Amino acid sequence: MQPVANKPGHSSRVLRLTAKAFVLLSGLSIMSAGLWAQPPASASWPPPRHFDYNYAHEARRAAEFDLDHLDAGTLHDIFAERRRRVLQAIPGGAMLIFSVERAQPRRLEFQVPNSENHDFMYLTGLEGLDSYDSALLLLPSAEKNWIVLYTSGDPAEMKQATGIEEVKPLAKLEEDLSVALTDYRDWRITQIRRWPLPAALAKAWGRDHKVLYVNYPRFLRLGMPEPPRLEFFERMRRFSSELEMRDSADILDPVRMLHDAYDLACIRRAVQITGEGIVEGLRAAKPGRTETQIMEIMDFVYRYRGATLGFPTEVQETPLPPAPPAKEIPEGFIDFVPRSQAVFIRPGGVVHVDTGASFRDHSADIQRHVPVDGQFTDEQRRLYEIALNVQKTVISRIKPGVYWWELHNLAVQMLRDAGGYDKYYTYGIGHFIGMEVHDEGDYEQPLQPGMAMAIEQGVMPPGGTRIAFEDDVIVTDTGHDWISQNIPMELSDVEHMAREKSRFESFAGKEPLSLAPEGP
């Protein structure tokens, strides 16, 4: 079988991701030196608009958006508006988005069940069994914008579930596309009447250059089996030499980067639930408990409140046990401890959590801490205040027109001025959030209203106490909305929380468990 990377229309995606990987690796070296490369001189503010939509209004409206009383008609309108924006952004040709029924690691990070299906879910609202073996065809044309859902389910039920008027059995997809690839000039009037959709697609495509945007895999794990849709795409390309396949991510990523009020309301709810889980988990972080117990408390709260995990919850007590002198533990890899392994919390440390609930497939991403003895030591307090000051200052600068690199360089400079801690700050200032915890977005563009972002930085001296904050922020037309600010982070609030009892005390006994024996 021909490698995926060599397929026409797919090689550009591979090259683009390869370039991203090069930029990421280069960025680590740049960031360790304290600088993030500035965007090209051609970048300007405000950026060009690809569709007419008031994202500033949506960002303002999200705070009052009622997620608990949404009727089917309102949800249909939300997804119809998304499809309209995508149709408006298609520069020519058509778009075909298949549902995806397999999970893959998110860019070599972690397992998220719906990751590769999020584009289909974003446009239809369908997930799980409702989305099984389905495809969505979007065709902008002067006469009519075609939106057709092909489904393996009952067409009448799917029409009611999505509000999409044109719903066909999945078996009709291959027939429609086969007919549409015929030169439109060969069509007779009776054929046009018989196949209105293929006729419209054939006319829109023309004769010499037929563009079809398709959802290639976002993950490119070449060692894994190819998804079936790639073989279908390849058969279509062989059927017509004029057909050019392009990656739908080129259109969908900019649309998904700017959120509507429903998106932002879901992110807000995810942050709220995450805060509840963090408070309960960190209240229980006492000497003798295990990191796994803290993880499970937070995860239980998320699920009890109607959410799932945006990514695997990470709990870690610092300082870490000393490593052999020759061993370097890369930041970002030290947190993943198997839940079957009992890592006991010891007196005198600080428990750090990196966690996020996902509500209706929109993820939060928060980092917080608690002193396990109920009070920070003088050194812990000093490091905590440094990181907290940096976090507040960086977030205060968020507004439309600001670049990611400006926020990153500000954090690096402040960490450097505080005592050279920029040397150990080995990742960027943050990332977009949305349906993915590390969502799609363009980091060279200035910030715009409707973006949702996680801001993270911290003080991580080798062998010392790790203090790292992460907060979720929405960009508004007037500045920003710091939606995770109510999750305890002020020193006095955190110490007070550390001395409180968790509502889960009864599961672990009235008193903290005794410490595990010292290991070899």
Language-model features: where?
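Bacterial N-terminal signal peptides
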Residues: 18-34
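Active-site neighborhoods and metal-handling regions in enzymes and metal-associated proteins
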Residues: 7, 35-520
